[in-house]
A protein has these predicted regions:
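Non-catalytic helical/linker scaffolds that mediate oligomerization, partner binding
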Residues: 1-242
Length: 242
């Protein structure tokens, strides 16, 4: 998910030479910042940032957001947490969505980098329509199939339909590791376990959607549910920090 398609085959070749199993890790249905003309930009409180649907090279005044359809679902007042709360934005003007952009205001200063995850305020009860796989993910899976890669870690899986879609795209030739890292996944946990080959608990991303003090308890619930269905689980990220 953090590599380019051009780099992917190179990394696959390295893993084969080292005789290490390789896993295709998808971006999944996560909102991310686009490319920037610099490694990062610093924004102060009350700065304005234009958020664009189309792919642009961002700068100190405007950035692109993907998937593009998410901008059409945002409303004025919505809060966006960028890169583990490094930067916090509030949507303040959506009147230009027909022109391909909306306006946000910085409410907590910080740095913005390229390809960084964005979380919409979990207190917002609306459900957002997000693709299970990005176009880049689909191409990465094709490269994996061509190179006989047998594992795909599917990020931000939200329900069993998403698992089945990944299985369809991989032609049923890859074992699916469903990553549990959002509220929807917790609500649909049993059906996700049923359709998956393995689970992965992403404690870091999950802590952006539920209070961090609930992570150990939630982790235990997921492990118990998976054990009940004889499904193996990876426990990943932010282990040493707690």
């Amino acid at each position: 998910s953090h590599s380019t398609l051009d780099d992917l085959e190179y990394y696959i070749d390295l893993s084969k030479k080292a005789d290490i199993p390789f896993i295709i890790d998808t971006e999944g249905s996560q909102i991310r910042t686009g490319d920037l003309s610099s490694d990062s930009y610093h924004f102060k409180e009350n700065d304005k940032i234009l958020l664009y649907k189309k792919k642009i090279i961002g700068d100190g005044k405007r950035i692109s957001i993907r998937p593009s359809q998410i901008l059409e679902q945002l409303k004025e007042g919505d809060i966006l947490y960028v890169d583990f709360d490094t930067l916090v934005l509030r949507i303040n003007d959506i009147s230009n969505i027909s022109n391909g952009f909306i306006e946000s205001t910085v409410i907590s200063s910080g740095y913005l980098g390229k390809n960084k995850g964005i979380v919409i305020d979990p207190q917002i009860s609306r459900r957002f329509d997000m693709p299970t796989l990005s176009n880049k993910d689909i191409e990465a899976i094709k490269i994996g199939l061509k190179n006989n890669i047998s594992l795909v870690a599917a990020s931000f899986i939200r329900n069993s339909n998403a698992v089945n879609y990944v299985r369809k795209i991989s032609n049923g030739k890859m074992k699916i590791i469903s990553k549990i890292e959002c509220l929807d996944a917790l609500e649909n946990l049993d059906e996700i376990i049923r359709e998956s080959d393995y689970l992965l608990i992403d404690r870091g991303d999950l802590s952006k959607e539920i209070p961090i003090e609930k992570i150990p308890f939630t982790q235990k619930i997921i492990l118990n549910r998976a054990n009940n269905q004889d499904t193996d689980v990876f426990v990943a990220t932010n282990l040493l920090e707690s």
